[in-house]
Amino acid sequence: VAELDAKKARVRVQAGPILTAWLPFATVRAGPDRTWHAPEAGEQVVLVAPGGDLNQAVVVGSLYRDAYPPPADSADISRTAWKDGAVMEYDRAQHHWRLSVPSGGKIVLEIGPSKIEMTDAGIRLTAPRIDLN
């Protein structure tokens, strides 16, 4: 990926000497339920180009490479790792869910008026009722 237009959900891809037009990229969901995880500059992607015209291509996925290896090495682990050090991971063998953000970050869980906020300074619970057992 050479460039990202996040507002239009399009990327330009450098394929050898060719810089493509702005191309759409695939996502997991794009209907009433939607996901967003845009490809970034420097990311290696796979293009499907009907008729071989790269300017009509669609980015259908990304590939690991030496600069950006897989973030896990087990089929039991589903893991997303961000460049700032944040990690979201589920290990189905251990039944363990982990969410980690770097120092200075915040984790917020909300359901209606109830909220849990976690920062370096502590944990704040806000709710109509709090039961401690």
Residue ranges of model-derived segments:
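Intrinsic-disorder/coil detector with helix-boundary
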Residues: P102-N133
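Conserved, well-structured core segments that form or line functional sites
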Residues: V87-E89, Q94-L99, K106-V108, K115
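Exposed beta-strand/loop interface patches that mediate assembly or binding
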Residues: V1-H95
